[in-house]
UniProtKB/Swiss-Prot annotation:
Residues 1-20 are annotated as: Disordered. Keywords: Angiogenesis, Developmental protein, Differentiation, Growth factor, Heparin-binding, Isopeptide bond, Mitogen, Nucleus, Phosphoprotein, Secreted, Ubl conjugation. Phosphorylation at Tyr-82 regulates FGF2 unconventional secretion. SMART domains: FGF. One of its GO terms (molecular function) is fibroblast growth factor receptor binding. A motif (Cell attachment site) lies at residues 46-48, 88-90. This is Fibroblast growth factor 2. Residues 1-9 form a propeptide. InterPro entries: Fibroblast_GF_fam, IL1/FGF. SUPFAM superfamilies: Cytokine. It comes from Bos taurus. Acts as a ligand for FGFR1, FGFR2, FGFR3 and FGFR4. Also acts as an integrin ligand which is required for FGF2 signaling. Binds to integrin ITGAV:ITGB3. Plays an important role in the regulation of cell survival, cell division, cell differentiation and cell migration. Functions as a potent mitogen in vitro. Can induce angiogenesis. Mediates phosphorylation of ERK1/2 and thereby promotes retinal lens fiber differentiation. Monomer. Homodimer. Interacts with FGFR1, FGFR2, FGFR3 and FGFR4. Affinity between fibroblast growth factors (FGFs) and their receptors is increased by heparan sulfate glycosaminoglycans that function as coreceptors. Interacts with CSPG4, FGFBP1 and TEC. Found in a complex with FGFBP1, FGF1 and FGF2. Interacts with FGFBP3. Interacts with integrin ITGAV:ITGB3; the interaction is required for FGF2 signaling. Interacts with SNORC (via the extracellular domain). Interacts with glypican GPC3.
């Protein structure tokens, strides 16, 4: 590109589609990779939540849905359940959406995301180095256990 030149980008794709989101937008399934131990967040059909290192595990495919600005719900695609944080800080998967299923999603300065409970606002979704979830009251800012990298889960 020559100095002083201006490049313009098309406002709409040539096929006339909306083009509102680039490829890989939030509607595509994701895998949440935890910085602590290299586990992917897994939601089981029986409601259990943990982490696994196996990239091909079908239960790590997650649907992140924006509920309002900065707030998401996280649904296990295969399990058909929603990630929830209970009043004692346990993570589990609920068959239906409740007020315990909403999380503040924040992009941190290190480019990892954190998911903080909207209902229990000082607690985060977190995985221990063993792959087990970490209780909400034991989580806090600055911990590796709360850092997740959203990755594409397209087949």
């Amino acid at each position: 590109m020559a100095a002083g030149s201006i490049t313009t980008l098309p406002a709409l794709p040539e096929d006339g589609g909306s083009g509102a989101f680039p490829p890989g937008h939030f509607k595509d399934p994701k895998r949440l990779y935890c910085k602590n131990g290299g586990f992917f967040l897994r939601i089981h059909p029986d409601g259990r939540v943990d982490g696994v290192r196996e990239k091909s595990d079908p239960h790590i495919k997650l649907q992140l849905q924006a509920e309002e600005r900065g707030v998401v719900s996280i649904k296990g695609v295969c399990a058909n359940r929603y990630l929830a944080m209970k009043e004692d800080g346990r993570l589990l998967a609920s068959k239906c959406v409740t007020d315990e299923c909403f999380f503040f999603e924040r992009l941190e300065s290190n480019n990892y995301n954190t998911y903080r409970s909207r209902k229990y606002s000082s607690w985060y979704v977190a995985l221990k180095r063993t792959g087990q979830y970490k209780l909400g009251p034991k989580t806090g800012p600055g911990q590796k256990a709360i850092l997740f990298l959203p990755m594409s889960a397209k087949s």
